[in-house]
Amino acid sequence: SGSGKSITCKSILNLVNKKFNVSGEIIFQGRDLLKLSQEEIRKVRGKDISMVLQNPMTSFNPLYTIENQMIETFLEHMDISREKALEISKEALEKMSLKNIEKILKKYPHELSGGMLQRIMIGIAIILKPKLIIADEPTTAIDSINQKDIIEEFILLKKNLNVSILFVSHDLGILSHIADNLIVMKEGKIVESGTTEEIIYNFKHEHTKFLIETKRALMGKFKKVKK
């Protein structure tokens, strides 16, 4: 918490408050995203780079149904009719193994669980086939059962769509299952980076040590309670 993970993710898509001064370079497919106009970066969002947020409720407009929001998203990024957009919306939910699709589409965001909203966001990303998915602590706001399912969805995404995923989490246990490489941040700076195996088994920075030992201590207490 407070290490700068989320603000870094938002900076990539120019979603930070205008009061923030963002400098440097963010190179994506040969282009510096910081130099793009608002119109150009808007076209990158969703189609080329999708973002799955920590609290899925903030990704949806509470005044519109899921159907309306999915259709508008696909119309924005794809040259298709409204009827085709509805068909694709149903396809996206089917890919997430969601049941009662017709009912889900007619629901408002507050009528669905956090885990279900996360699946809808991932389903939208699958249809748009972005080059990069930024997942900003997508398992934090949902229960442990849904966490496992969401992690599996991301693993399948990486495998089946050959998409790059920037997965943000404070839980090294989760990251050990999904990440090929790790970056450890503290107070807005990168303090350590390397392959997942290198970071977990041969860490060098004290902050990395703290994160790993904290996770191991929690797991030890959990096992004692379980017994």
Residue ranges of model-derived segments:
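ABC ATPase "signature
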Residues: 193-194, 202
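A short, surface-exposed alpha-helical micro-motif characterized by mixed small hydrophobic
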Residues: 175-177
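C-terminal boundary and immediately downstream tail of ABC-type ATPase nucleotide-binding domains
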Residues: 201-227
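A short, proline-enriched helix->beta-strand linker immediately N-terminal to the Walker B motif
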Residues: 127-131
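Conserved ABC ATPase signature
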Residues: 107-112, 116
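Conserved ABC transporter NBD signature motif
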Residues: 21-32
